Amino acid sequence: MTGPPNLLPEAPPQPGRRFPATLPAAVRVRRPTLTALPLPRLARAVAILAALLVYVAAFRATWIDDAYIQLQYARTLLESGTWGFYAGYPANTATSPLNVLLIAAVGFPLSSVERAVTLLTSLELAGLLWLLLRLSRCLFGRDFLGWFGFVAFATNPLLLSTIGMESLLYALLFVAALVCFIEDRWSPMAVSLGLLTLARPDGALLLAVLLPLATAPLRRKAAALLVYAATIAPWFVFSWVVLGSFVPDTLVIKVGDAAWGATSFADGLALYLNRYPLETLASLLLAPLCVFPLWQCGARIVKTVTVLAAYGTLHFAIYSALGVPPYHWYFVHQLVPMLLIASIGATFHVVRSAGTPVGPWLRAAVVVPAVGLLALAWNEGFPFDEAPINTNWATSTQYRGIGEWMRSNLDPTQAVRVYGEIGTVAYSSDRYMVNEFSDMSFADGLIEQASYAALPGIGPLLAFNFLWRRDHPPLPAPSFEFVPVPPGDGPPGCPLDDPACRMVREGSTEWVGTMWLSVRATE
């Protein structure tokens, strides 16, 4: 027999043997058909989704402030058809148009964008499981990588700290594009890459990695580029002409954010290791598994690992050069490739150990990725009352309390100037919250003042990007301001010598410790 060797050997591979080079016909992945799922498989799928719904709901209190920005966009879109914070006032600060659209679409039948987030997150995790199992059979002819990778994604503290944002959606589409690339399915890959770019503009970097590494003829690459362009064109044309920019205004806001001082994305990991040592180490728990003898693997595995390593490195280099702040969700672009490479490394060792005394024990290692989250739950209690890793000034529960106070005590026509985080308070108060994220006239001013002299060659690109930019009407003039005040020894309450003060509430997170957040009259 001249076919390739069995992928499930009963003894370790012989020295020098490449493992595995190709898939035998018996285990090659079949493309899905439209036939109905057998009842047992359907029952398992329903049980998995139900379990995921319960699991995801347990993290309801951990949604960070930036997640509520996307919820605010989705709710406004549902209620008024406006792309922005408030009806009749367009804005362009939602970093993930696809995530906002999905939340709005699912929120419509559920009558709640919050319930939509829980359902979408559960579906994204279920989709990840299906794709990871497919990737596992593609590379190894068995399911271990799929289950190991799924546990790694579903229990990673950093990923769980971004629920409500686009991170899990991004991971899902990233793996979808990778699987299509490995299976040589170019049109679905191009669609996946297009959706990935709509989930975050960074998705274009994966396209830049995949095309040079592909061995397909130039004609197939050109066709894939056309499909990719057709997928992203409707949104980007709308964004360019109607919103005045191909990319969200947050690019200008974040690049110009001076709140982080000298700390940037390049040295952000050191910051999180210092401020969140256990949580950061738990997120990176599987990193040592990325080191394994890749030269003993077949071409398909080598190509997969090359794609993952190249993408993570390219993204890190670009974000470091831009000098953007080290927001924790930016590191998802290194985390996703790391988790996938680690899952491949773990599966490599499990398959090599088949037929040895330790083989059965290694299969139980599928639960190892959950150790970090379990350690955090043991140390801090579960469910968590804030995201394991976050940079907020108050928990979502505290911000919601402040927003509810505003709803009860401020007139609907009154606006509040926000100096700080806006998402949760805006969502909970149903009042006009004014800053650069909600008021497009602020972003107009920042764009006019922005200097890109340190980025050679970007000037003409920016001129083209803002070709359709027009001035936008401001939100109503603020009658109040929402500002942080230094922590003190006294109980929450307005200082007796400050007649403008209307309310002071405590904010406390692992990031800032304790601080007071106040609402003051501006008139």
Locate predicted features.
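Intrinsically disordered, low-complexity proline-rich regions
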Residues: 10-14
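Membrane-proximal envelope and lipid/glycan-remodeling enzymes
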Residues: 15, 19, 23-523
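N-terminal acidic, proline/glycine-rich, low-complexity intrinsically disordered segments
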Residues: 1-9
